[in-house]
Amino acid sequence: MDHERLKSALAVLTVDPAAVGGLWLRSRAGPIRLAFTDTLAKLPFPMALRRLPPNVDDGALYGGLDVAETLHSGKPVLKGGLLDRPSVFILPMAERCTAKLGARLAQALDLRQHALIALDEAAEPDEALPHAVADRLGLFVDLSEVRSIDGPGLLPETAQIERARELLPQVQMPAERVSEIVEGCRQLGISSLRAPMLALTAARILTALSGRTRVEAEDVLHAAELTLAHRALPLQEAPPPPPPPPEPPEPNEGENQQDEQDQIDPLDGIPPEIVVEAVRAMLPDNILQTLNMGSRLRAASGGQGAGQEQIGNRRGRPLPSRKGKLEDDAKIDLVATLRSAAPWQGLRRRQAPAGTERVLLVESSDIHIKRRKEMSDRVLIFAVDASGSAAVARLSEAKGAVELLLGRAYAARDHVSLITFRGTAAQVLLQPSRSLTQTKRQLQGLPGGGGTPLASGMEMAMVTAKQARSRGMTPTIALLTDGRGNIALDGTANRELAGEQATKVARAIRASGMPAVIIDTAMRPNPALVDLARTMDAHYIALPRATAHKMADVLGAALEA
């Protein structure tokens, strides 16, 4: 992003930060980002600029009961939260924002009282800001390729900002400008309705910054570059049909037509294709190869950031209580709290005001929180290669292994899911279940043969595992294949592309921390599968003649690991 676009983005953000939602800044920590954040601190925002800790809890966000002051004063004392007054928040390490925090920030941004500047330090393509937050931030700045930055030169003039704020309520948006933005979003593959709304908001602000009260085509193009480039998908579109041949002009009409054309403003109306090309000109060089795959991986991973929490779906036996803070669903261990406060009563009464001799003096440091062991149902997700000549044998082995594991599942509370991939795509035949009757019914008559969409099977297994994890379960992926993938994610036969996509999905599985096992069913160990297992950080097991009992024993051991 060049200097002028950076300056325009900061000017738009400064005029009305709550209206555009905020800024998504992608940059690793270093002098470039430090200079940019120093510039942010000098912008004349209409609201306070406040730093938001990445581990902020609900008590800090919303406020609530101040336990320490309540215990000290003997009556309820409430404290305010960060969201009590309009602010522009700076969120460091935004790529590690949890889904829980992302949902709360999204709700706050919907009120149009706050703005968020997300500092995204993602080092890998599969690390991303939660979608709920990213979708609400109108502006995007990528400093990854920037080598130097002129911080003072990016600061907009204060007089220009104040004049733009005065003009903004008077800015009119013609209907044709709205149509251009909406059609451009459609052609760019942008499905979110917030995208055109944020682009139109940015266009109105740019118009006010120019000292005008009517949005022109150039404002729409400029706004599209600032707000839509990071959302666009590089769709491969068919070339438009050739225009019909022009009709021969009538005599004495050539001069009249030329005079009319001279009076038309070339920017008065723009085809949507111009908006599309303006946005595509802002895309990174490698976006055509990586963006579509990256969107698949983010969708599969839920877009919940690198710091997604793991919770159990069942509560186990009680654990010894520990000192802690009252937050979320924490419960006080009253006996342990009183036991902690008892030895200090004599000292505290001598320091306390008169009239508290018969009052039990408890401080926040005495609070003990009840704990229970988090129990989590386990689920083993089979991704079975059902392609090729050996498909029938592999499927029968998988059927037997699934039924054997289900027979053991009742005591251990394990679940089993079955995915097959053949032809051009993968298919979930059995969602996580412990029902023997349902499983046997689903396993009857499984088809086999066709191509090997290995990447599709791995992606489907990752999606199923993420869904199970979101319900508090502990998933393990078991990939049963000979490793000869030849079908890409789009269903085309391309062995080289299929291998590259399988490697990218393997990296995404590894980044999600999902345990996995790869069972090589080829007659001889496949070196490509060994590399894939290393990329996925999965256990590799060569079982060229895998029987149902042997497979069940191996995968049962993987569950216990």
UniProtKB/Swiss-Prot annotation:
Region (Disordered), start-end ranges: 234-268, 298-324
Pfam families: AAA_lid_2, VWA_2
Catalytic function, reaction form: protoporphyrin IX + Mg(2+) + ATP + H2O = Mg-protoporphyrin IX + ADP + phosphate + 3 H(+)
Disulfide bridge map: none
InterPro entries assigned to the protein according to its UniProt record, in alphabetical order: BchD/ChlD_VWA (IPR041702), ChlI/MoxR_AAA_lid (IPR041628), Mg_chelatase_ATPase-dsu (IPR011776), P-loop_NTPase (IPR027417), VWF_A (IPR002035), vWFA_dom_sf (IPR036465)
Molecular function terms, GO-annotated: ATP binding; magnesium chelatase activity
Pathway the protein acts in: Porphyrin-containing compound metabolism; bacteriochlorophyll biosynthesis
GO biological process terms on file: bacteriochlorophyll biosynthetic process; photosynthesis
Compositional bias segments (type: Basic residues): 314-323
Enzyme Commission code(s) on record: 6.6.1.1
Keyword flag Repressor: no
Annotated TM spans: none
Alphabetic keyword roster: ATP-binding, Bacteriochlorophyll biosynthesis, Chlorophyll biosynthesis, Ligase, Nucleotide-binding, Photosynthesis
Domain VWFA stretches: 379-559
Broad enzyme group: ligase
Known function: Involved in bacteriochlorophyll biosynthesis; introduces a magnesium ion into protoporphyrin IX to yield Mg-protoporphyrin IX.
Family recorded in the similarity comment: Belongs to the Mg-chelatase subunits D/I family.
Name this protein carries in UniProt: Magnesium-chelatase 60 kDa subunit
Species of the source: Rhodobacter capsulatus (strain ATCC BAA-309 / NBRC 16581 / SB1003)
Name of the gene this protein is made from: bchD
